[in-house]
């Protein structure tokens, strides 16, 4: 069976690649090992948080993380063991936590954040129906030191709105007096990620994009400097262009003789119902404990914690209890009605820079992975970049790849 473009992976990045490739007139086939109704793209916070917000690795983060570890509030939990890549990842994370690297990354976040916003607008214009709100990201601070530090970065551009405790409670009615204040980053947005994924699926299927669900790619067939065949557990598929967007699963990446400095970071979320008057008025992030709380059409979702160096796909009840405990320290008591707990793995690089671009060996293979906790933020932008790259034909001809790919970042 021969295809023009095969996208391996049906998450937000894979679907965004399929969307932009289809827009260029290509015949696209998406291969997804699951039934396409659940996955990391469904369970995340839904933040489009590219603006005026530092990456995970930034100055001071190492010391701050160690302090939070002592209180069991750290955003990262490391399962230490005999895994050399974990220590390589940590070393890169630490060396990336400098002012120069952070300044560059923030600038890139802004550039590709606006591209993602444009792509979300295009999706809505195309008739897709999903929860989408451009009403900012409320950064709530629980430590006076970090609040003062954030205030020093605010300017009069309109991108920031500084709120005291009383004003913060108007946005976050359940907040208690243990908070210090907040800053509304007005340019950010949020979506219901599940609605985005389902809308993309429906749009693409109606447009003639082929979907092979419950079909797992298990290997590749190579010939010289090309991938001659994509081998699934059902068939062999040939393709002119193959886009590998399999998220945190490194199996197929390793089949292509690559071993990216990327870890599967296990994240958690709880989705629940609460009275409308108690819901946060916009997407919010308790910045000092790295916990997001996002309003949706009928529910609210909290997300937190990233565990590194674990393959356990089961929900850790201790982590869920810890999330609730950390949130309770800064909120009034409230009921999480009809709560749904979730966990999933994100492809996290140590500096928040994804792996994008043509493979160094196989000329018809394009990589699109490594967005970590920023999949919803940058997924649509990545789809556009990858589609443009397919026209350019080489990494070096595409400025966005040269700027935003880990292949070209020290």
From Swiss-Prot:
UniProt GO molecular function: D-amino-acid dehydrogenase activity
Swiss-Prot/TrEMBL catalytic activity: a D-alpha-amino acid + a quinone + H2O = a 2-oxocarboxylate + a quinol + NH4(+)
Required co-factors: FAD
Key words, A-Z: Cell inner membrane, Cell membrane, Electron transport, FAD, Flavoprotein, Membrane, Oxidoreductase, Transport
Group of enzyme by EC: oxidoreductase
Record's bilayer topology term: Peripheral membrane protein
Binding of FAD, residues: 9-14
Family recorded in the similarity comment: Belongs to the DadA oxidoreductase family.
Protein's UniProt keywords contain Repressor: no
Any Pfam family matching the protein: DAO
Descriptive protein name: D-amino acid dehydrogenase
Native source organism of the sequence: Helicobacter pylori (strain J99 / ATCC 700824)
CC per GO annotation: cytoplasm; plasma membrane
């Amino acid at each position: 069976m021969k295809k023009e473009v095969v996208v391996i992976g049906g998450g937000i990045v894979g679907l965004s690649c399929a969307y932009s490739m289809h827009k260029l007139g290509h015949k696209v086939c998406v291969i997804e090992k699951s039934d396409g109704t659940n996955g990391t793209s469904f369970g995340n916070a839904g933040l489009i948080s590219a603006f005026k917000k530092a990456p995970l690795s930034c100055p001071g983060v190492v010391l701050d993380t160690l302090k939070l570890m002592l209180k069991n509030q750290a955003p990262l939990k490391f399962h230490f063991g005999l895994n050399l890549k974990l220590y390589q990842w940590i070393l890169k994370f630490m060396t990336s936590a400098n002012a120069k690297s952070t300044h560059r990354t923030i600038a890139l976040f802004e550039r590709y954040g606006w591209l993602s916003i444009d792509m979300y607008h295009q999706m809505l214009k195309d008739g897709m129906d999903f929860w989408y709100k451009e009403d900012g990201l409320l950064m709530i601070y629980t430590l006076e030191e970090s609040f003062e530090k954030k205030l020093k970065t605010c300017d009069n551009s309109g991108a920031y709105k500084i709120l005291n405790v009383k004003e913060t409670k108007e946005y976050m009615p359940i907040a208690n007096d243990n908070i210090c204040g907040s800053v509304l980053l007005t340019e950010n947005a949020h979506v219901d990620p599940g609605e985005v994924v389902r809308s993309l699926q429906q749009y693409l299927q109606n447009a003639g994009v082929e979907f092979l669900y419950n079909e797992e790619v298990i290997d590749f067939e190579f010939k010289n400097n090309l991938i001659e065949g994509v081998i699934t557990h059902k068939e062999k598929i040939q393709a002119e262009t193959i886009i590998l967007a399999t998220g945190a699963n490194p199996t197929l990446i390793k089949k292509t003789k690559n071993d990216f400095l990327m870890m599967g970071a296990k994240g958690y979320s709880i989705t629940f119902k609460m009275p409308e008057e108690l819901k946060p008025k916009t997407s919010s992030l308790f910045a000092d404990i790295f916990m997001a709380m996002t309003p949706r059409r009928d529910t609210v979702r909290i997300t937190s914690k990233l565990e590194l160096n674990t393959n356990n796909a089961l929900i850790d009840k201790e982590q869920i209890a810890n999330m609730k405990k950390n949130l309770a320290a800064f909120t009034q008591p409230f009921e999480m009605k009809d709560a749904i707990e979730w966990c999933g793995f994100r492809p996290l690089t140590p500096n928040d820079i994804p792996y994008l671009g043509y493979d160094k060996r196989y000329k018809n293979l394009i990589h699109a992975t490594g967005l970590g906790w920023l999949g919803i933020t940058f997924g649509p932008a990545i789809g556009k970049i990858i589609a443009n790259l397919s026209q350019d034909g080489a990494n070096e001809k595409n400025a966005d790849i040269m700027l935003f790919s880990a292949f070209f970042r020290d």
